[in-house]
Swiss-Prot record:
<keyword id="KW-0720">Serine protease</keyword>
<feature type="signal peptide">
    <location>
        <begin position="1"/>
        <end position="31"/>
    </location>
</feature>
<keyword id="KW-0378">Hydrolase</keyword>
<dbReference type="Pfam" id="PF06280">
    <property type="entry name" value="fn3_5"/>
</dbReference>
<dbReference type="GO" id="GO:0006508">
    <property type="term" value="P:proteolysis"/>
</dbReference>
<feature type="region of interest" description="Disordered">
    <location>
        <begin position="33"/>
        <end position="73"/>
    </location>
</feature>
<dbReference type="Pfam" id="PF00082">
    <property type="entry name" value="Peptidase_S8"/>
</dbReference>
<feature type="short sequence motif" description="LPXTG sorting signal">
    <location>
        <begin position="1110"/>
        <end position="1114"/>
    </location>
</feature>
<feature type="region of interest" description="Disordered">
    <location>
        <begin position="1029"/>
        <end position="1116"/>
    </location>
</feature>
<feature type="compositionally biased region" description="Polar residues">
    <location>
        <begin position="1075"/>
        <end position="1089"/>
    </location>
</feature>
<dbReference type="InterPro" id="IPR022398">
    <property type="entry name" value="Peptidase_S8_His-AS"/>
</dbReference>
<dbReference type="InterPro" id="IPR036852">
    <property type="entry name" value="Peptidase_S8/S53_dom_sf"/>
</dbReference>
<dbReference type="InterPro" id="IPR023828">
    <property type="entry name" value="Peptidase_S8_Ser-AS"/>
</dbReference>
<feature type="repeat" description="3">
    <location>
        <begin position="1068"/>
        <end position="1084"/>
    </location>
</feature>
<dbReference type="GO" id="GO:0005576">
    <property type="term" value="C:extracellular region"/>
</dbReference>
<feature type="region of interest" description="3 X 17 AA tandem repeats">
    <location>
        <begin position="1034"/>
        <end position="1084"/>
    </location>
</feature>
<dbReference type="Pfam" id="PF13585">
    <property type="entry name" value="CHU_C"/>
</dbReference>
Amino acid sequence: MRKKQKLPFDKLAIALMSTSILLNAQSDIKANTVTEDTPAAEQAVETPQPTAVSEEVPSSKETKTPQTPDNAEETVADKANDLALQAPAKTADTPATSKATIRDLNDPSQVKTLQEKAGKGAGTVVAVIDAGFDKNHEAWRLTDKTKARYQSKEDLEKAKKEHGITYGEWVNDKVAYYHDYSKDGKTAVDQEHGTHVSGILSGNAPSETKEPYRLEGAMPEAQLLLMRVEIVNGLADYARNYAQAIRDAVNLGAKVINMSFGNAALAYANLPDETKKAFDYAKSKGVSIVTSAGNDSSFGGKTRLPLADHPDYGVVGTPAAADSTLTVASYSPDKQLTETATVKTADQQDKEMPVLSTNRFEPNKAYDYAYANRGMKEDDFKDVKGKIALIERGDIDFKDKIANAKKAGAVGVLIYDNQDKGFPIELPNVDQMPAAFISRKDGLLLKENPQKTITFNATPKVLPTASGTKLSRFSSWGLTADGNIKPDIAAPGQDILSSVANNKYAKLSGTSMSAPLVAGIMGLLQKQYEIQYPDMTPSERLDLAKKVLMSSATALYDEDEKAYFSPRQQGAGAVDAKKASAATMYVTDKDNTSSKVHLNNVSDKFEVTVTVHNKSDKPQELYYQATVQTDKVDGKHFALAPKALYETSWQKITIPANSSKQVTVPIDASRFSKDLLAQMKNGYFLEGFVRFKQDPKKEELMSIPYIGFRGDFGNLSALEKPIYDSKDGSSYYHEANSDAKDQLDGDGLQFYALKNNFTALTTESNPWTIIKAVKEGVENIEDIESSEITETIFAGTFAKQDDDSHYYIHRHANGKPYAAISPNGDGNRDYVQFQGTFLRNAKNLVAEVLDKEGNVVWTSEVTEQVVKNYNNDLASTLGSTRFEKTRWDGKDKDGKVVANGTYTYRVRYTPISSGAKEQHTDFDVIVDNTTLEVATSATFSTEDRRLTLASKPKTSQPIYRERIAYTYMDEDLPTTEYISPNEDGTFTLPEEAETMEGATVPLKMSDFTYVVEDMAGNITYTPVTKLLEGHSNKPEQDGSDQAPDKKPEAKPEQDGSGQTPDKKPETKPEKDSSGQTPGKTPQKGQPSRTLEKRSSKRALATKASARDQLPTTNDKDTNRLHLLKLVMTTFFFGLVAHIFKTKRQKETKK
């Protein structure tokens, strides 16, 4: 026999161990930093977000969760944080050609006008709370330090002493204070993010900078308080840390605090009291806290559209959800400062186009280029040697396109968009290869241009953007989990140039970049108001500044949809510092609480009442109207785009001097309700803006957003329906097997974390070999030598007789799943535990079990906080949560095993929205501990090696599997395989087994065991040698919990079949969805090789599946690196398992 190649298990184990050690080391370095461009339920600090680095081909089978139109191929920039850790891209040192600032060239928010009136922040202190900073950057500079609030370190120390602050260092005249509130004593790996954010707020680069234009923040002459905070000991501790930073910033004199980080979808109500008090303290002192809305788009993340049946798809979390904060969304203006390239067109005209480059091309050099299709095949690159490869976006990852071009001899890559009006995308750095991204329009021009040369210019210019004015697709939508209106306002956040570590500058994108601009504007506006309204208290000036800034914002209009972007996406609109500075009027709700109107639930007809405030000495005449709109629906999904319904007519109003007046606008959307309810059966938003002009033909003067919900928002379903109830076998995050819709595979050692996400009950499948070992006294499961493992599966699912790799839902005649357990302590289907995909945040989740009379026999502990499963991504959160506290092991309140019978397992929970009522979901669970009755004797034919049992097994539950197991030594591991019955019920026993190396092992009769399991998980195993002796099994030889000759004296109500145990019929197993009985496979007789894992001796340390180690409600602080370690670990185990499976399956088919 040919010697088979030995599988490198030892090498894999070494690689696995090394990987684990390295990842643990990296975990120690990075601590718990989770950035908002990698959205997380436990995320910490938001990093540049929407610069996608790879592309994926949409699955042709994806029917439930199509990709968003703007994100057709790329895996959104959830890898931006990883890119920050890669080798930096080469940048050409450009001598200073001008002392002009970036804002001199492009100022979409019109900050310069406000700076001229309020100064540039001299004498003011601003604070930035973030994950890390380069505290010695060249941009941290004061033009005139004699105007600074803190003239010296001694001044700072005096202020610290007054407020009992014993920590924090003076860095220089600009950075008056720096402290690490994380208390981990480590240097932040990510210094980019906080440095970039601080530069937008208060950067002040010197004229000697190597950049062509000088960075100047919104408040360049303000002093900085840099406060490092990141997750170290959990979210609650993290929130307390940034609360302490807020208090210190206020006490040290900060006028504004920027917080560009967040925890997606978390509710303000769940923050620690210390954090809420810190927000209130800042407000009382007139200190503005500005937060980023987040980069998590909406429910489903950036690659899925939310379902039209579930309108609560907002993901703005904390701290942005706090009412006292000013929460900022991101948009792209119609013009941008950008790198450029020039081409000579067919008519000999010079055409400039914007480019976003990674590893810049040599400036002012003419490059030849050649078209290379989508850069997938070798033939695409036949003409690119020594030239730039022009490649269309799509089909494969950007990095693969670049690598392919480099391999073909290209000197650079130009990738053009495959969709119109798309956003620029930062390409990955592949071996320092020059690469740049351009628009589709410019790419097609290059493709058709007869002169195939291009020149990259040294100096950036302001050019129109391909997208036009547009909300960033990554910017998080409201409402908040509490049901409040957020975000408040929008600012540019796409490709923003600012400072990064080591005296460098770079473009980053994200709401992180939008917030500090607004923070600077707020600081300047409050400075203006100190002079303009000296009699006001600081808190009154803060309140006025926030209302004026929101009122003067310009509502952004979607030219494609001919409607305004939703207030749940843009807030009040794009910030306009010039309008805010000049404003003498503003608009609020009728109670003068804020400059937004939350109507909560509305009917088809309702009214919007607002208050117009006039702070001038003259009466003001205005015209007003309201826009009415809702969500656009595409098929079964929200399109994340607005749908205009109608606009009211313009009306006239006069507001007396130094006074206010209310305006009421009647809305009637009844003519749209039939069509809208057909598209959104659970209700829909009716929203828009009440807009004011001094003349109907002139530009908008001010506006206020309003939001109402036509339906019952508070009582929308919080939980996705169970997967058992799905007609096509799919859920939002789960794509059904088209050939077997009821297939729900267990976890095993395969990493199904991104796959098994739906609402269901879980349980465990425990093989008889492990049950036997435990019964024989092995206390530590790691000491059990077996090729089989304990596996987490879904209640009501069963494998086939000869294939343990797939599980299928088995149903009763009424269609409900056959969820049955046998809580006898053997670890096999002993319990059920709840797993849910939550569509909304909820509170007070509890599981309880009711008997057939409706009496509660058991109640779980309460899970107080449940966060919606807004994404299915290892970098953020999974598409379902397993609740450890809901595990029911078949016992009552007193810890006694309940009687056999059918019970209702109920999960209760309440949405956290105002006015919500408790909801619940029920599952039927059968409990049955009845001992199996099996044959006590058998005969064996030596001629054909057939084993014939004296009788068929009997039980109160259908038989799941009846098999002959045999165990042999393969190297140092006992390996178990199974034999399925022949059509006549006999078993053909093999004479030998084959090892992984191809060696044969003779089998003795003592190697064989008869194993029977029913659908409740009761297992009995008997050595074949005992069957052949014709003797009844003794208790110590029998695998069941009781001796076969000592049947329990069951009362009628204790029998799961509804009959008394002494009158049990020969139960015929029910059939599963495939039309066959689970475990029964016709025309078998050959050995059915176990598909459990060859290397599970090493893997058994995990006991349960890898999936159960993922974050649960009791383990909410597991972060991205911990998930990465788990992925790597289970990947290696899965690889070994796959090799073993493949080998065994091939042998079985021989």
